[in-house]
């Protein structure tokens, strides 16, 4: 399996995992978090479709579910109830991993496809490093505070 096919296999695993997280979310802001997880699996599904169709047009083989599970067996999440933090924490790491695989796949595709991979990489990094981090409040920086002396 080349880097492009491996990336597609990872997207299949990520899609199935996010679908499971969507179904098994519990606690907190359930309604809005459930809705956001749904948006993520729809987004990954659209990307997966585009990536596979593009790969087929380049002569690459679509990895089967079996291929994907064999390649990424340690990434398959069991279906079980999960809180918001665990669910979105997984997505944060999965998006970052997917962005790295998109970058690696650029080496085996023509320039126009490289551009598409970079667009998806940008979107995943934006979601992970800005939106999800803020959602989790994990590493969002706080604004610096300044003491002003009004007597000057």
Language model feature labels by segment:
Residues 14, 72-123:
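Acidic/histidine-rich alpha-helical segments that form the ligand environment
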Residues 31-67:
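Conserved alpha-helical segments that form or flank metal/cofactor-binding pockets of metalloenzymes
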Residues 142-152:
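Short acidic DE-rich linear segments
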Residues 4, 15-22, 48, 52-55, ...:
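A structural signal for well-ordered alpha-helices, especially hydrophobic packing surfaces
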Residues 14-39, 101-114:
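Helix-loop segments that flank and shape redox-cofactor active sites
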Residues 25, 51, 55-58, 62, ...:
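Leucine-rich amphipathic alpha-helices with coiled-coil/heptad-repeat character
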Residues 2, 6, 28-39, 83-86, ...:
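A structural signal for alpha-helical segments
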